[in-house]
Amino acid sequence: MIDFGNFYSLIAKNHLSHWLETLPAQIASWQREQQHGLFKQWSNAVEFLPEIKPYRLDLLHSVTAESEEPLSAGQIKRIETLMRNLMPWRKGPFSLYGVNIDTEWRSDWKWDRVLPHLSDLTGRTILDVGCGSGYHMWRMIGAGAHLAVGIDPTQLFLCQFEAVRKLLGNDQRAHLLPLGIEQLPALKAFDTVFSMGVLYHRRSPLEHLWQLKDQLVNEGELVLETLIIDGDENTVLVPGDRYAQMRNVYFIPSALALKNWLKKCGFVDIRIADVSVTTTEEQRRTEWMVTESLSDFLDPHDPGKTVEGYPAPKRAVLIARKP
């Protein structure tokens, strides 16, 4: 069973202590009532993983752990089998004692695009909204963050995160909670808040921006990464039934429209840091994620369009400050 006690003990001693007024009851309710039917199977995979203290740990350039002496073929096979029980792996990659988890997304490429535009993360307390398996949280720690807290209600991601954490020597500098942002009080406690790949899934994108702002300290930094389309400050795509085969895509603004949304929500110093077309090299099927991926969602005769005829995925990173 996944235990959140270490996190409670950690925040009891810092400026997040007021979160303890609501968080333990929320987690207890989730443990009683909301667990996925496969959660026991996934958590067993985590439990059966060996506890290893890495001799070499690299979170700055990748998420890589190595032992002083190479593991035996049997040990490597055991780790690989247990990690495969947690498929599909969408966000990564991870290199753990000779087991290379080639995830659907090259999340390291996104991090390389984002990192040069961030304020120095050294010593910061960070919230990662919709953090997936937690890959970017480990990279935040590698960049000097004091604490990275991720929230994501997808329970497979929680188990993937806990599996990686165990293989990183039970590292307590990052924590994942199975919650959505709407379940968080206005903590106003994080130096940097990341929301990457979330906004277009929200029925009310401006409400999401307000929720992000409510988590930031004054002068805190928002890092927003989302789908965009080309156009002026009034351009917003509202897809029909699906976009790139996803049903839960509601609003895709232009980067300029998104700047206006952020301004309307009270953010300042707003800048478009990066715009990139998503390629089939960055998002693709692998042996760790064997179902459909981006190439299946694009028009086979025109890769500049989705199968529905919309512009193919393009993403922007915007940076803003809460005054």
From Swiss-Prot:
A Pfam family matched in the record: Methyltransf_9
Binding of carboxy-S-adenosyl-L-methionine, residues: K91, W105, K110, G130, D152, P153, T154, I181, E182, M196, Y200, R315
Catalysed reactions listed for this entry: carboxy-S-adenosyl-L-methionine + 5-hydroxyuridine(34) in tRNA = 5-carboxymethoxyuridine(34) in tRNA + S-adenosyl-L-homocysteine + H(+)
EC number of this enzyme: 2.5.1.-
SUPFAM superfamilies: S-adenosyl-L-methionine-dependent methyltransferases (SSF53335)
PANTHER family to which the protein is assigned, alphabetical: METHYLTRANSFERASE, TRNA U34 CARBOXYMETHYLTRANSFERASE
NCBIfam families per UniProt: PRK15068.1 (NF011650), tRNA 5-methoxyuridine(34)/uridine 5-oxyacetic acid(34) synthase CmoB (TIGR00452)
Record family assignment: Belongs to the class I-like SAM-binding methyltransferase superfamily. CmoB family.
Entry protein name: tRNA U34 carboxymethyltransferase
Native species: Escherichia fergusonii (strain ATCC 35469 / DSM 13698 / CCUG 18766 / IAM 14443 / JCM 21226 / LMG 7866 / NBRC 102419 / NCTC 12128 / CDC 0568-73)
Higher taxonomy: Bacteria, Pseudomonadati, Pseudomonadota, Gammaproteobacteria, Enterobacterales
